[in-house]
């Protein structure tokens, strides 16, 4: 039987407008194991009290609206409303605080990131009483996460498929990202894979343009993969971007990739959308395809410190929606990413259980139970001199992706790939021997240069290249 609830129909209805905090600010509330918890960074308009702003966020992202309505009496708000249960000031900020909101599980459709985000980060972000609003973190309870398939395969299954263990995987984004014909594109793929890389990759905006239609690209890349595998004896792959203008077209491309026998496809999960991504992830699990995820458009959402949504939330959403790889920044390259913050959401992608750790931006303890993990991909402005730091920061369960750092080699694509493979193997061996890569990394690379002319040439060409700018999004 459903629980007995008191409704307004039985106690009378009083029209009018009242403060949100009278209903939605509940500091005495004890959160439940089944609640979805959210941490919002709230910047209210001048004159709006913290409690009212926090309650407004809880109301407008759950059951509330701007005035009392008669139909409130037909249900139990106490059962379904979001609750602002705690508020804490942000150190160093005069008019900013973290509002903690608890949402009952019944507010959300099972297995739908789309519905989850429509509620929690929907209209409330345009609310006039707030100057800015940012979702910093979500706690997804096992009762909800178990309604999702999650990644198609996960880290261990991918390693077993590739028969590659004990080191990061190596990749390369084919450049120039736009303009190559399909045959020349396939040639670049072959050279990189033959030179020693595990994967090559379509760039995020390579779909099906007049200069290179998707079917032609898929065919030439499959030929390149097969040829490189035959010559090297290693399993190879190319991230064939299945992203398209419709879900039907996306699935058609994924089906063709499977028919070609390639091991992995790719999707732009933010521009493509969570519904499309989840559909593709289900297809990939059912048909043995790995799924690489690009995060194109993420910085529009997550780069500003005061408004939007932190990438750790997008990372959790991706793990639920489904993907075996996702781009996660580099810390040392050309793209935004502070070390502690990056490692915080990298753990949220890979590990089963992550403790609350505010020093790394993790607001809630997260238990993924048995959901497979996602490999973080470090990509963007990295080269051989970064290899020791990348190996030390990301560890074995990662993909290190060098686009310009492979194709920009003065001797060509295959030597560029060889240079990266030698640098990686040298760093892994040094680490396994107990050497400190953070302190001795450059020495490790120089030693490897003595027996690898390809690496020596790469080290010479990129010895002065650095991307040293202040990080915008700090803790």
UniProtKB/Swiss-Prot annotation:
It catalyses: 2 (2R)-3-phosphoglycerate + 2 H(+) = D-ribulose 1,5-bisphosphate + CO2 + H2O; D-ribulose 1,5-bisphosphate + O2 = 2-phosphoglycolate + (2R)-3-phosphoglycerate + 2 H(+). This is Ribulose bisphosphate carboxylase large chain. One of its GO terms (molecular function) is magnesium ion binding. It is found in: Plastid, Chloroplast. Keywords: Acetylation, Calvin cycle, Carbon dioxide fixation, Chloroplast, Disulfide bond, Lyase, Magnesium, Metal-binding, Methylation, Monooxygenase, Oxidoreductase, Photorespiration, Photosynthesis, Plastid. Residues 1-2 form a propeptide. It comes from Pinus wallichiana. Belongs to the RuBisCO large chain family. Type I subfamily. Substrate binds at residues 123, 173, 177, 295, 327, 379. The disulfide bond which can form in the large chain dimeric partners within the hexadecamer appears to be associated with oxidative stress and protein turnover.
